[in-house]
Amino acid sequence: MQCEQSKLTRILYQQLREKPDFELQFDAQVKDVTQHRSGVEIAIERNGRTETRTGRWLIGADGARSDVRRALGIEFPGFTWPERFLVVSTPFDFRAVIPDLVAVSYVSDPERWHFLLQIPSLCRVMFPIAPHESDELAVSADFAQSLMATVVPGVSNYEVAHVTLYKVHQRVAKTFQRGRAFLAGDAAHINNPLGGMGMNGGIHDAINLTSRLVEVWHGTKAEAELERYDRQRRLVTLEYIEKQSIQNKRNLESNGTDFGRSLAEIAADKSRTYEYLLRVSMIASLRRAQALG
């Protein structure tokens, strides 16, 4: 199942706005975080004014440039890939010209790999952009067409809905918890999108943390239970999400022959196939987190 983040957020928004004890505020920026023995206070800037909010805990799920993470003084080590990624969205129906094309298709090429993601009404095609290729060149119409012409021989002059160019990072916060404040999602970890592990990993963070908060809130578990969140989620992020997403990129940069042979060997062995599917589906990472206690 493919569900774009833009669609998921709208679904969540509709659900949350109907909750009587839930308040959604937009255009509000966290400026400071102060922790007390029994709670957290944040200063937010909204409509030109500074306001304060208090609570027992704080979850910073405010993206890769997290103001909460910065206010807490938590480092965000890692690296930025030298390549940028270009996404070209087109209504062209690749399934009509590529037999047996699936919803997500990866094409390895040491010169310039690409992958196709089919969503309702559009197909998104991603390419790496080399360091020597400027941003201006990358988003130009002619350059996008030249890349798209390599996808299917003989097909050119695609209708392009839009192009998006962005930098790609691999970073994991030094800790996912500081006192009564927690980090989740992109605020805690970011990775290249190959394999679809970013948003899924963030959802795993949310379920892991909030289930513990509910238990502590209702008094069925002590507050020490919350420390397991950082212990579990940060380690599996390093061991699985970061490691696998980096390997996915390296696989695409290969000539495809060795990787194809490796996949064929895995497919021929039921036990290895099972282990491989557990890993790439992220089920293995959930089991690993549970085993950490």
Please tell me what each predicted stretch does.
Residues 1-293:
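Core Rossmann-like FAD-binding/catalytic domain of the broad FAD-dependent monooxygenase superfamily
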